Amino acid sequence: VDIEQYGTRVKRVASKFIREDERASIASGDEIYALLLHWSAKETMFKLMEEEAVDFLDHLRIFPFTLRESGVMEAQEFRSSTEQKFLIHYDTHPDYVLTFACLD
């Protein structure tokens, strides 16, 4: 589970966690919510992984999705030998975004 407060600060650090192949999802909707959801989803993935030295830019990917008030996005980590896939559920609210996932 991860919750991120709504705010524009995320734009200043986006280059540290947004991959080139993730930019399409950000361009297709509300930029702040899309960035916050990417960050929050990657935090959720990180919390479920049993790996150290995870680089959010190089090791975690959110696949393209259409931004809605709530939904599910597919993601994958590339840090471990299993390169685990995730289904990350999300909700957006005026003040925050929430993401959560479970391991199979």
Regions found by a protein language model. Name each.
Residues 1-104:
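Core catalytic alpha/beta fold that binds nucleotide/phospho-ligands
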